[in-house]
Amino acid sequence: MGTIYLFRKTQRSLLGKLTQEFRLVTADRRSWKILLFGAINVVCTGFLLTWCSSTNSMALTAYTYLTIFDLFSLITCLISYWVMMKKPSPTYSFGFERFEVLSVFASTVLAQLGALFILKESAERFVEQPEIHTGRLLVGTFVALCFNLFSMLSIRNKPFAYVSEAASTSWLQEHVADLSRSLCGIIPGLSSIFLPRMNPFVLIDIAGALALCITYMLIEINNYFAVDTASAIAIAVMTFGTMYPMSVYSGKVLLQTTPPHVIGQLDKLLREVSTLDGVLEVRNEHFWTLGFGTMAGSVHVRIRRDANEQMVLAHVTNRLNTLVSSLTVQIFKDEWARPVLASGAMPPNMLNIPDHHVIQMPSLKSTMDELNPMTSTPSKPSSPPPEFAFNTPGKNMNPVILSNNQTRPSGVGFNYGTTPYTTTFNHGLGVPGIGNTQGLRTGLTNVANRYGTYTPGQFTQFKQ
């Protein structure tokens, strides 16, 4: 018999979670309008795809893909309402704003993939151009144009509105802007409509409808069926050129990059923060775009020991909150200090060297693993080198090698005994089979010379 859990938490399926979130969105009356336009879009797309099949027009198919993109934009707008209703959770501490960024990126990338598919199909049609039926070509064009413009202008799509303004201009917008300047020079009243730049979605809808109208006229007059393929290529190229800057911008937001137009302002604010009273250093600063129009960041601030943490935190937050809405500031007090230098009298057993000493050398493998041959200091592979201090053994000291069969020199007042510094001898020099001498690395290289007892035959040196 299995274990019975009285208060076990039920796990909801993915479909159940989606249904719960959909009910949360539909609770807001503003989403009803989006759902209505979405239903109409599905019906219009179904009719347009049927007419594309009956007319055998590739240009109308490319224009229908713009209607499908409008459906994606409505879904993005619905996600934007859902993001405003949701509160941050432990898993998503910064909120759910990146979901609408991901939705914009996915919509623009799918539109570009559809444009590439149209280009591939159009290239195949150049080899053998089929006959185009113009019975419902013009009807489908006006139905798609009216619905696209009506949905774009009736619903305020916040994510796409922000991206279309923040992203770089497409080549279609630049060419239309040049023509608009020339036209506004003749008719100044049109400057409010065409300048500074038109909405890219409205522009591509109008340009695609004009291409289809030209296609209809040429096929009706001259039976020139190749113009349908040319119009399909033109609509696909315009679609790709319009969506590419938006996908690049939303992709940079997903990669947590800092917007280029904000870098100068952030540098100025960080310089101001570094000059605040009590602030010693500003480091590990990282700022990125969390969502459309929302920035997040984190910074580490090192302050003096006597500085007021709350006061510094308030000033830093006040300076950076003008640009960064979600800010994390970590305050560190200056607790760094140099290691205490050894000072005082020399221990008396420092110079105790036995007459006939036998020093038990440590294992060669363990010693070489534990000691660094350059500093004689225990080191770890991942740890930084030890801090330099005076009167300590180091690589700048000249080592001393003591002979094993040395004689007592006259005039030296050494007390012979066992030396306690068994771990400071050079490893490998006293091991049988390697050599018969043992090296003592010490910071007292010049001690013997200091007491006037150094003789060239007594000590020898080796180079590192």
From Swiss-Prot:
Major location, coarse class? Golgi
Query: Which InterPro entries does the UniProt record give?
Result: Cation_efflux, Cation_efflux_TMD_sf, CDF_SLC30A
Q: What GO terms are given for molecular function?
A: monoatomic cation transmembrane transporter activity
Q: Does the keyword Transmembrane helix apply?
A: yes
List localization entries. Answer: Golgi apparatus, trans-Golgi network membrane
> Which domain of life does the protein's organism represent?
Eukaryota
> Membrane-spanning residues where?
34-54, 65-85, 99-119, 135-155, 201-221, 229-249
Q: Which residues lie on this side of the membrane: Cytoplasmic?
A: 1-33, 86-98, 156-200, 250-464
**Topology versus the membrane:** Multi-pass membrane protein
Q: Name one Pfam family in it.
A: Cation_efflux
A Gene Ontology cellular-component term = trans-Golgi network membrane
Keyword Transmembrane helix belongs to the record = yes
This protein's UniProt keywords: Golgi apparatus, Ion transport, Membrane, Transmembrane, Transmembrane helix, Transport, Zinc, Zinc transport
What spans does the record annotate as topological domain Extracellular, numbered to this chain? 55-64, 120-134, 222-228
Give the GO biological process terms.
Answer: zinc ion import into Golgi lumen
UniProt similarity note:
Belongs to the cation diffusion facilitator (CDF) transporter (TC 2.A.4) family. SLC30A subfamily.
Q: What does this protein do?
A: Has probably no intrinsic transporter activity but together with SLC30A5 forms a functional zinc ion:proton antiporter heterodimer, mediating zinc entry into the lumen of organelles along the secretory pathway. As part of that zinc ion:proton antiporter, contributes to zinc ion homeostasis within the early secretory pathway and regulates the activation and folding of enzymes like alkaline phosphatases and enzymes involved in phosphatidylinositol glycan anchor biosynthesis.
> Can you state the subunit structure given in the record?
Heterodimer with SLC30A5; form a functional zinc ion transmembrane transporter.
**Which PANTHER family does the entry mention?**
ZINC TRANSPORTER 6 (PTHR46531:SF1)
Under what name is this protein listed? Zinc transporter 6
